[in-house]
Amino acid sequence: MAEPFNECNLGAHATPDFIHYNRLKAWKAQDSSFPFINAHDTTYNVRDNSNWEYTLKPRLRARLRNSKNIILILSENTKESRALREEIKYGIGELGLPVIVVYPDLSNSQIGNGNSPGYMAKKYWDKLPSLKKLIESVPSVHVPLSKDKITQALNDNDFTIQHKISNYCWRYHD
């Protein structure tokens, strides 16, 4: 994602990671039992050219305060924009929100084996220095972009702020 949004007419929604995010929204629209709750719906929408300090950053923080966890899409196209860096630093670093990391480009075996992240997953963390620094401070589950795997992770109370388990819990669902 560009700083903070893509400049084309479609804005952020044209970036590859937002296409994956829109897939989550489509799954929810097609299946009401899909447990995805879109935090962006908890505050009013803002324009891509809104002021960062007075509009975008406060909306992002309000959304995070209303969240039980963070779903982070981490792909070969992910870039650490100002907005993503703020989401990670505030959501993980200050609020302690558990993270569900979704890897659209990786299989279960590339993501990790049981309680240890795999080489490829760790390589993707290099794209987000703020995540790499903070990921061990909260519970996290790592899954491929699969409706079943994401459903499993979202339904797991261990990865919600209300019931979170110990920090640095590397596990994903087979």
Predicted features along the sequence, with ranges:
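Short, glycine/charged-enriched secondary-structure capping and boundary segments
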Residues: L24-A26, R85-I88, G114-P117
